[in-house]
Amino acid sequence: MCTNYAQSFAQLTTLDYNILTTNNLINMSEKKIMVIGSSNTDMTVVADRLPVPGETVLGGKFAMGPGGKGANQAVAAQRLGGNVSFICKVGKDIFGENAIRHYNNEGMDTTGIMLSEQPSGVALISVDTHAENCIVVASGANGDITEADIESHRKEIEAASILLLQLEIPVEAVVRAAKIGHEAGVYVVLNPAPACDLPEEIYQYLSLIIPNQTEIALMTGIEARDEEGAAKAVEALRGKRVQDVIVTMGSKGSMVYHQGQATFVPSKKVNAVDTTAAGDTYCGGLCVALSEGKDIIEAARFATAASALTVQKRGAQDSIPYRKDIIL
């Protein structure tokens, strides 16, 4: 419950909420990108190395800011030129209040944000000096998103051109959103993170799925350490009726599988300091490029350029670049 947090937001009125969620859209694309997913407050500490189980290590710098895979991807798409609507659920606490104000300031449509009696989601992130990270998430309000909540936004989903989903909210809600989008002819994109067992039903609703190497191995049972392994794993996924697949492969780049053809898009060589939001920036950037009419290979190159900038800065949303920063 929200009693452990700031009381001012716990007494939020309808008028206050409407003011908070009044959108201020500034974008380059008229096609709507609908993002449905998580909203967290990230608490990040930097250490020389990540602890092993049972070990305590001393950290260095600490930072707190907005995060969550859904929110990160929505912010990335907005900053990179997209026309974004974001549907999420936050608690009636100071974290929720700050999140709504932040998303509104980013310029996205925030009228789909819902309030929960659960506390807002929180992510505890540890990052080492080699830019590797580990994350533990307390879902809070994110876990309170129901199929009924998704149904209440059916018209908005059906009006979108692209629907971008992740797995930090209940999978039943994700499946319902994907089905609504698919049946309305919306281009449905799933980033299956964090990795989990997916119901077979969802695959038929997807236009594109974007797993990393760990996620595709969990979904198919096939390791994707290199291009050959990725190709075998993708074939297994395509057998589930997914149209297109992009496997992100960290600093190596990504493999794009489209209409039976595989294309490798290499990453730019940069000095990475924090990979926390790299995948989210990639997904958001890819959807922006697709909404602007670029083909999937061009879109992957744009997404790669955006994520290359992200890993050069610390933090989640603090590291996400703007359109003017992208150099192809």
PLM segments and residue spans:
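Glycine-rich phosphate/adenosyl-contacting loop at the front of the ribokinase-like
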Residues: 1-3, 14-89, 94-100, 105, ...
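Short beta-strand scaffold segments in enzyme catalytic cores
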Residues: 75, 122-126, 253-256
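Gly/Ala-rich phosphate-binding loop of Rossmann-like dinucleotide-binding domains
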Residues: 78, 182, 291
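Conserved N-terminal subdomain of the carbohydrate kinase-like
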Residues: 53-57, 64, 79-161, 327-328
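Conserved beta-alpha-beta core of the PfkB/ribokinase-like small-molecule kinase fold
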Residues: 162-232, 252-254
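Conserved phosphate-binding/catalytic region of the ribokinase-like
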Residues: 17, 23-33, 196-201, 227-328
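A short, aliphatic-rich alpha-helical micro-motif
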Residues: 156-158, 203-204, 239
